Structure formats: C-alpha cells, structure tokens
Amino acid sequence: MPAVVTDQFRILNASNFVDTVTGIGGTDPSNSFYVTLGLPNPTIVGFGRTSTWNTSTPNPVDNINNNNNIGDTTLFGKRVTGKNVRRLIRKVDWTQGTRYEMYRHDYSIDSPSPVTQSARLYDSRYYVINENFNVYICIDNGSSGINTTGNASQDQPTFTDLEPSRAGESGDGYIWKFLYTVSPSDIIKFDSTEFIAVPNDWTTTNDATIQAVRENGDSDLNNNQIKKVYIDNQGNGYSGGVGQEFNILGDGTGGKVVVDVVGGKITNAVISAGGKGYTYGIVDLGTINANASIKAKLIPIIPPSKGHGFNVYEELGTDRVLCYARFGGDNKDFPFDTKFAQVELVKNPTSVGTTSIYFSDSYSSLNSIKFPSTTTSVPTIGEKISQSVTGGTAVGYVASFDKETKVLKYFQDRSLYFGNGEDQTDYVGISTLGQKFAFQSTANPITAPSGFSGSVETTFSSGITTVGTKNVGLGVTFTNGLAEPEINKGSGDIIYIDNR
C-alpha cells in the first residue's frame, strides 16, 4: 500500500526536538544535550579509523558497536541550551533579476512549482531573506495562466509593515509579506550560506514584533485569511466590467474578491476581504458567466493554518534544527592542542559513578594524569602511551598535553587491545595484551614512542595547580595525580554523528 512520511511529520519532529532541548514552554528541561568532539587520531590503524580519513572521509556507521566506541574516543562536550538551538529553513537570498515563486498550497508531483519544478512547497523558491536579514514570503510574482513562471524580481523588499505590499515602483508584479527579522544574536550563532534561523516560541512569544505578525495572520481575529486569487484561466465571454466584487465560496466564510472583466476576459482579481476558515475556495462568478464560451478558472490560494504569519513553522517548512556550541575560553575541559574527526550530539549522559543525568555546562570525557612541573618531554597527540602496572601494561592514546600545567589527557578504546587494531582476530599474547588496565599512581614511568617519559605526580590531589605565580584551574579534580572523566564513558544516547 502506498504511504508517505508527510512534511508536517518532519516539521513536528523538529519542533519536538527543540521542545525537548528547551523544555516545554522554555523552562525546566528534564533532558540534557551536549555537542561532543572526539577521535583525535582517525588515520592510525584502529577500529573505526582509516588511513584515508582526511582525503576520503567515511560515512558514519550507525550501530551499537560503533556507538560504544564513540563513547570511548570522545574528548569533551558542551551543553546545548534553548538559547543555542533553532529551527532552520533553506537560505534563499533576494537577488535582483531572479525569478521567485509565489506561495501556493497545491504544489505536487502532478502540479510542480513553475520555476524550480518542485513537487513540494518547501523545496520551491517562495520566500527570501534580504540584506537586512528580513524574511518575506512571496504572495504574488506576477504569474498567471498566460505567464506561469511570473516575472523577475526587480525591487528588494525592505518594509516591515504587516500587510502584503509591493517593494518598489518597477512594476515587477511582486507582492511580499513580511514575516520576521533574524535577530543579531541568531545571526552570530546560526547564520550560514545554506540556512536561515527561525525564532523559537513563535506561537507563544510575547515579543512585540512577532506577536504583531502572528496576530495579523490570525483570521479568527481579523477575517484576513486569503491574500491571493490566482487567475489560471481568464475565460471568455464574461459580462460586466472592472471592479465587480464576488464571494469566495468553500468551507470558510467572508472571503470576497474584486474582479476586472475586459473584453469578456477576467484580467485582474484582487482580494477585498480575506475571510476565515477556508481549506478550499471557489469564486462565485454565477452572475456574469451566463454567456461565457470559455470557463474561467480562479484559484483562491489558501494560506497555512489561519493565515500568513500565524505559524511560520508550517508556513516555511522548518524541518531542520541547528545546535550551536562554542568551544573556547579558559575552560580546561576543552584542550586546544588536540584534534578531532567526529562531532556528535549526545542526550542525557550521566555523571561519573552515578546514574544521574549530567547537567553542567561542559564536561571532559577523558582520563587525566598530572606530571611534575619538572617534566620536560612532550608527547605527540594521538600516539600511544604505556605504563607497567600490576598484572600487565596500561596503554592509552594521547588526546592532549598541557605544557604549562603538565596535565596529559588520554583515552582507551578497543583498538589498543585488538591484535590487528581493527577486529577480534586472535593473536599471540592476547591473554595479557588483550586485557584493559588502568594507569596507576606509582613511580613507574609512562612512556611513548616519540621519546616522552614521565612519572605520575603521586602527591598531587587537587583541581588547581600553580604555574609561575598563577593558580590555574584544571577542570577536573585529581587524586594522587590521576583524574577520572566527569561522565560515565559511553553514557547517553548518540542521536547525531558527523565525520569530519
């Protein structure tokens, strides 16, 4: 049986995700989301890696096995809050001389948009963003049954009036409807060459500008639903002249259109009353069609929801979401000397040693080792370190080394214990080399192939160290020179993976 996942389902999914991040109504979220960075050594021989990563980046693998490994190779995370998540739409810049498409409720495979041949409204070019970051929807582009693609736009819309209007005096036939202005903070966080940010909480916000647009689009308040009647066929043999007003029939009420008849043909149709409650409409030309030899076809264009501007998520098709995270500042959770090849979005990681959801602004998911200030050698990011410990040898990959604080951060993933680095193929020595050992707070040196060598500062138990005359916070608390991650390794649900 034929079936389809609808556009409205996609829009709903995006809205549900935003609500999950921000909390319903924007308060007291019960979930915690983090953008994480990981995999600093993607080109070595190892599980989930490839020597050609930097030139031919592989597609992410979505299964439990790979997700578990991502948990082991993650470096750190930054929390995403309601201020840092937005719905998105495709960016369509206004450019003089470009032919845009008008909003229509009936684009389909059988009746695609005339310029881009899009079967979906949301794939067509029916809205623009101008140089001032104002977003407008195209109510009319001068198109009709005898000019199906409309005209090239000559006048950039810049007005912020509530009612649809032409943008200038060129006569290009365009009528634009102002929707909103992208805020300066959203420009800084979310602007890109591909997408436009859409404000959160459109349907409930008390922001004066948005509220005015929303209420102007509420036909229950102002009987202002329909803005355009499209002349698909002018017909012939119609009586009367210019300025004749007719009712718009259908399942709504109050809609009226003023029609001009010239030479028996309908040459113009302008809404005089938008009405309310329409999901379809038909113009009642019964008083002038008695002698019509060719029947006219006038199509009332039905806005989404209650009217243009009432619900921009439905109007613009906000089926994408962007999360913004800024890694920087003095936060020691984010080492600046590392690399990363994967970006993830993780939901509800748990605090180390507990089952409680982690809610702090950021976290380190790496183990840390504090070396004495006299340590002079420096390891290479991504290389293997090792230490002789009780029962065997502890091994790990270097994620970061702070030359000032002498803190080394490392991770341990399955590649260290697979004989070939990649899978479970048996090998000689597996009984000892296949076991995972933790680094220990002993005098036994930690070494690396680059020549790095140093011993744990076993007397260091603090989250602050002294560098010269400064006290420097380390982001984690050490006990006898060792520190655990701030979250349980691999905890939380990975809902997005991006290989870089």
Model-identified regions with their sequence ranges:
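Tryptophan-rich substrate-binding surfaces of secreted polymer-degrading and adhesive proteins
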Residues: M1-L221, S293-K297, Q387, G392-G396, ...
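Conserved, function-critical positions that sit in or immediately flank catalytic
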Residues: E169-R500
